[in-house]
């Protein structure tokens, strides 16, 4: 048995019902529940078809205004995180569909110009509104309030992702715990997740993505600095 199979986020896990919960029912009952896809596979498809995901291709990871075609973009970064987290999840026996959905979603709220752009926007928000800009909160705002997809009746609705995938957006922010990254037990309102590492991620799969995020950007950023700049 793979070491983490007993805590993987599948049906039977004590957290399962919370993990797959959505803000509202996904489909009108007249159309059925589209059983050919899992809950997290639906989320993955919703994300890669939304405009916020598409815009990641125009946002560079670290260096801006580059003259080099091989500078890493956000969309490349999330795909690398998807690949790394998928490898780790499969090795440990975790739910790789969940890690993939979290991976492609985790940076959905990032500003242009990387963390420097985030800092500038935060300064403006603090000065003008007494608030701050943080890509973790902005990602939740995008998928919960701004991004729309047509349902089976042609009505535009927000993405309405599962709790476990939404949790991975603020949950990936900040460095992993150096003493070991473990998920939290509490089912918290994600709107209360207002800064990095306020809460641990809710699932082991989100912990894997948090670590994969660090693996991805540390190696790629170093490569960019040494070879492409």
What are these regions (language model features)?
Residues 227-229:
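Conserved small/polar residues in nucleotide/adenosyl-binding loops
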Residues 2-156, 169-172, 177, 189:
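An N-terminal structural lobe/cap that precedes and organizes the functional/catalytic core
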């Amino acid at each position: 048995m793979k070491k983490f199979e007993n805590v993987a986020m599948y049906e039977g896990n004590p957290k399962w019902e919370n993990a797959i919960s959505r803000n509202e029912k996904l489909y009108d009952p007249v159309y059925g529940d589209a059983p050919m896809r899992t809950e997290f596979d639906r989320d993955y498809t919703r994300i890669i078809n939304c405009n916020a995901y598409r815009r990641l291709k125009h946002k560079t990871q670290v260096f801006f205004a580059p003259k080099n075609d091989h500078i890493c973009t956000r969309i490349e970064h999330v795909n690398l995180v998807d690949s790394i987290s998928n490898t780790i999840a499969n090795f440990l026996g975790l739910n790789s569909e969940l890690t993939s959905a979290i991976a492609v979603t985790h940076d959905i709220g990032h500003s242009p110009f990387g963390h420097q752009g985030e800092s500038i926007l935060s300064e403006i928000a603090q000065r003008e509104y007494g608030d701050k800009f943080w890509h973790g909160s902005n990602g939740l705002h995008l998928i919960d309030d701004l991004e729309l997809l047509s349902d089976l009746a042609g009505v535009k609705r927000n993405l309405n992702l599962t709790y476990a995938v939404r949790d991975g957006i603020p949950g990936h922010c900040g460095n992993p715990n150096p003493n070991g990254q473990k998920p939290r037990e509490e089912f918290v309102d994600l709107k209360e997740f207002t800064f990095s590492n306020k809460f641990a991620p809710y699932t082991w799969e989100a912990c894997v993505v948090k670590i994969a995020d660090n693996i991805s950007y540390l190696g790629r950023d170093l490569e960019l600095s040494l070879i492409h700049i």
